[in-house]
């Protein structure tokens, strides 16, 4: 099971990466430095193409089109559409694009869509492109991935928006809304279902109860009755809905409530080409409907009904009506819709179908009739009404004229229209009843504390023919776009305020206000005018259109068409739309004959009676905000109705305005989230994108409008550390990290402005508190600079790599050349020896040596063989004993090696564990650092909260003091008024005390003036403080939520650290156990374990520290909660105080007029104080400016110092590299010199060997001449080697020249880069030094070659002085003595030859006699030599016919034994003595024997020389 879970988890992770994460191929170096731009095309498949910008002077730019044509245009945001660098391909949030324009947005969407990624953020938007195929991105495992994750931590997804809304609702305790808009077929309904699926999964009960099933299953019922096939969508929702998902205080889902808008009832009676009626009509006619029920309802097949067979479209691809009907019945069961209600629903649907088949005929031009009444009777029976009454209501309805009812005959078209109105009313009210039923089952208002609303409504519609329905939809989207603009850019500008970015607040929410007023504003808006014309008896569509032209001719959003006088145009935010006013008044009235309405109210079927109950419809008498939430918002073509206050005519326009006002009121009370759905193509093909279609939808959905407004702000932003880490390489000497990232980023931007003023503009950059902000396109320009810098780096790296590969190939070729020359030299030496006359003479003379007493020698040899056999047996015994001992020693060695290997493995394991612990420790340190930063931020946030609390307490105290002071002032003011009057009387009576009284009065008047001013300020401050307290309370609540979230993160980190701690303790215990077992001889491992233990203790101390910080965070959270409660109490007190202040305000305002004259005197003082404050502010600004200049100067000096240090480091590194290069070249030259010396030394050795082998032979003079010739040839070879060395020296010089040329080329290519030029000069100087070193090495080589020449001359003279054979033997003995040490060293290798000697045992027995006489330490070598001599003698005795084969065999044997013979001094001496005895004892054959011995000696020495070579 665990394996299955792991495998399943891996598959889920794979699906997440494959279908939700963009697979970036990494950095790609641009092929060129061309500047590209987007250019509009006339191609139907491509809206834009890439063009090259050939000229750009800042004001105008020139581009080269694909056909080679060049065009110039002024450079502005409209004309110049920049192409983003590859780094921005496939970004998850299009708000991050460097160039924010239409083609850039389209290109990014296409990139992601091609990779099966159809979710993309665009600022606050989530853009969802319909994939037209099933992908595994909505599974329960994917839900678990997004559960509780922040939006920026996971890939874009509808689940991420849903989770963000849910978490925001719980944290802020504010209702949320999710606005899903788009054209039909874009996927609005599917995304709505995914939102419900996600919220039900994360907020429902773990085991999944009935309510969760009901929430998931009520949608199929709405789809059956409200969805239909259209040309764009097989399951198009023909109504808008707002689903209110309800939650309790704990965040558990408790129910749902649905509001509907704009039901397309006209589809019941007529459909467009290739479209169907609502699904329910086909489902009840499918094979899933029981046959007995079909017979009861008189149903047959779709082809038999007029409302279904108008377009002969009865089926839908990939949809089985029978299965969908079964699914709907299952949903009925889950929602507890009983059999009686189901039957009533099916009866109503069947009655509509039968009413559609009524056979109307013309009785005359003014009267219609029925051909037969079969269908009429069936419909009347199903509706529970009389057939006669139904017929009269359809053909001759009654109207009220005064106090009398008058019957009015209808012709065929009007009778059919009356029938259609009845069918639409029946279906519309049936749909309302179903929605109300679902709401009664799902809604639990008594348990509801919060809710999330999901709005599924059509986006902006611009068709070829636009009517009243399109105006209502576009009017809705104007309101929603205004709502979005206000919300989006209020948040955006709050971000600027937090980051202290200079910004003038702009209310973008008013951009659509003119268009909205044109449509809705009373009394002359389009909809009020339509209502006015609707109630006029003589009004028609033409009079309505004329009224529009008269009223709005000069309105900036209203246009008059050039051709059609019955149409008008409105300029919406998404574009200009032309509306046809045909049948607008009729649609606004949506008439239903009173006779038919009353007939249905009196139906015998209770269900039908309930459909026409006025309580089914919402009342519009009161304002929407005052109304209780209606179960449904109405329909697209709402019929007239009666208000509860009496007869009241309600138009569709009025009704819809009220519904929309109610919707906007609900949305305004929520925090909204926006999802925009897009159709990629009209063919419903996966992987295909129609550029113009997508652009039109982006425009209609407000995405491009949002981008337009975003250009006015600072859409691109990065944190300082992120920006520095990515772009530090654009400034020499900059590092990816800095203690002050903001200052480092400022320096980097200043450097870019100075270096690239045409690409980086200081007016396009703003520095915030924690982030750097850019205008649209500025960040893309910086990214281009970065790519250019990386391109140069990559080119340099490639050049270095190619140079390294070329040098390695050159070295390999040179080694191959040297090896080939050595082989050629050895082959030439062998051929020279083979063709040497003396060697040929030796080969021919060898078989002619005189015979000796071989029988005696054979007997002696046999005797020696027996003795040697005994010795061999003894040696075998000794060898066997040694073999046993060796085997035991090998076994012990193997055991020791195994133990050593095991010990090494354990040590490696311990080292690996140490490395793992070190990594864990590093991770812990990083986590601790992150937690410390979070705790610091939390502490600062807590401090801010405390500071706000203190300020609020101070303000509260001041407010209370102000109020108390105000009360005292009021009383004092009344008393002062009385005193002033009494004093005035006293002044009139007592004129003599005028001076003293005047001073007292003046002082009191000043007091009164001050009190008046303070009173006015108190009144203003009271209002300001009230608003401030509210905003601060909200901010405090948000801060508390943030602290709560941070506390959750810290708690999770704590749990993770505890797990890590436990894991470390277990690993430490294991390590200690291993160390105890191998304590002996493993002190190093023990010390490592101690170090790991120390690290664990450090980790524990860090965990304890984190625990203390966590407790501090919990305390701060508790403090924040207490502050929140205090603020609530303060707000309540403030409300009470404000009520008192309002009461006092009215009394004080009466007194203001009396004291205004006294306030005038204080204005002068206020102006003086303001002037003084301005002066102080100027001084402060000057001081700040000087301080900033000083800081900038210090930073500049520090930067120069760093640059100097970097240059010194670079120079040092270059110098070391050149030194290493020179040393390498010197080693190569020394190696070459050694080769030359060995070659020169081999030449004299060969010559010396030749001269010693031909002593006492005839033609000694010719031999000496031959040796001289050989020496001369060796000298020529040495001179040839000297020429080769000179050639190599010339090659080195050529390489130096090539390097100089490369440097010159590098200087030419990079003349603008001073640093590269300096490096090239330094490299050239170093190579010149290397060249001088090479020259000196060459001179030393020439000197050594001269020395070698002298040695050759000296050895040649020595050879010429050699006159007798004795001297030659003595020199040979001296040479052999010099080789004795080498022989002794090689004897130690005899043990390795034991196995070979055993295989050659028979051959060794024949060599024992010869090796015993020699008495050499190397018994094996002497035995081999004797065996060679014995074989040689036996071959001579056997047959002369085998002469050639014997010679070849001897030659091979001699060649094999040359190396060994060269190393055996005593054996050669014995052989020389033996040959001398043979020469002395056999006079008759002395010449032949001597020549044979000399020849064999020459062969031995020649073979030795070749072996050395």
From Swiss-Prot:
Residues 89-787 form the Myosin motor domain. Residues 848-1226 are annotated as: Alpha-helical tailpiece (S2). One of its GO terms (biological process) is actin filament organization. Residues 1483-1509 are annotated as: Nonhelical tailpiece. PROSITE patterns: IQ, MYOSIN_MOTOR, SH3_LIKE. Residues 790-819 form the IQ domain. Keywords: Actin-binding, ATP-binding, Calmodulin-binding, Coiled coil, Methylation, Motor protein, Myosin, Nucleotide-binding, Phosphoprotein. Residues 1253-1482 are annotated as: Alpha-helical tailpiece (LMM). Residues 623-643, 958-1049, 1068-1141, 1170-1195, 1213-1259, 1352-1425, 1474-1509 are annotated as: Disordered. Pfam families: Myosin_head. This is Myosin-2 heavy chain, non muscle.
